[in-house]
Amino acid sequence: MANKLFLVSATLAFFFLLTNASIYRTVVEFDEDDATDSAGPFRIPKCRKEFQQAQHLRACQQWLHKQAMQSGGGPSWTLDGEFDFEDDMENPQGPQQRPPLLQQCCNELHQEEPLCVCPTLKGASKAVKQQIQQQGQQQGKQQMVSRIYQTATHLPKVCNIPQVSVCPFQKTMPGPSY
């Protein structure tokens, strides 16, 4: 009887430890940061390859940089901090009336697999953010970074990318880390 009790308690302890370890592992997987993760925004290896083959979405990077650098005359900000794309990016006349750089960006995004659109846009956004950091512009940097990610978030919708309407980038903007 003592052997059975010992065996049952040892089995329960083993399952408890196994469950506890797998819960911890799951939390670690979801809490990884792009800065410390060698894969960066590319959790899917296929997307990293597509990003490199698309020359890092050059036109999209240029568009994001242009939008970030525009102060007053660029995309409109509503009072609640949301981006108003209707005036500046979406044209009722269709894609032929888009600014040429935006049209090139949309063409690049249409060449991506739907699964890779957001990871590649995140990679392009990070590249633009690094360009702004290297330029050393301190004034309005947080607002520029916010514009980069706001623009990138809505580009799939603006470009009518099938199966993707927005890219849910996290709004994490601690002071010195950008």
UniProtKB/Swiss-Prot annotation:
Keyword flag Signal: yes
Disulfide bond in keyword set: yes
Signal peptide: 1-21
Annotated SMART domains: AAI (SM00499)
Classification via Pfam families: Tryp_alpha_amyl (PF00234)
Propeptide stretch(es), residue numbers: 22-38, 75-94, 176-178
Gene3D superfamilies: Plant lipid-transfer and hydrophobic proteins
CDD domains assigned to the protein according to its UniProt record, in alphabetical order: AAI_SS
GO function term, MF aspect, one: nutrient reservoir activity
Entries under SUPFAM superfamilies matching the protein: Bifunctional inhibitor/lipid-transfer protein/seed storage 2S albumin
InterPro entries: Bifun_inhib/LTP/seed_sf, Bifunc_inhib/LTP/seed_store, Napin/2SS/CON
Keywords for this protein: Disulfide bond, Seed storage protein, Signal, Storage protein
Family affiliation: Belongs to the 2S seed storage albumins family.
Protein name (database record): Napin-2
Organism (species): Brassica napus (Rape)
Biological classification of the source: Eukaryota, Viridiplantae, Streptophyta, Embryophyta, Tracheophyta
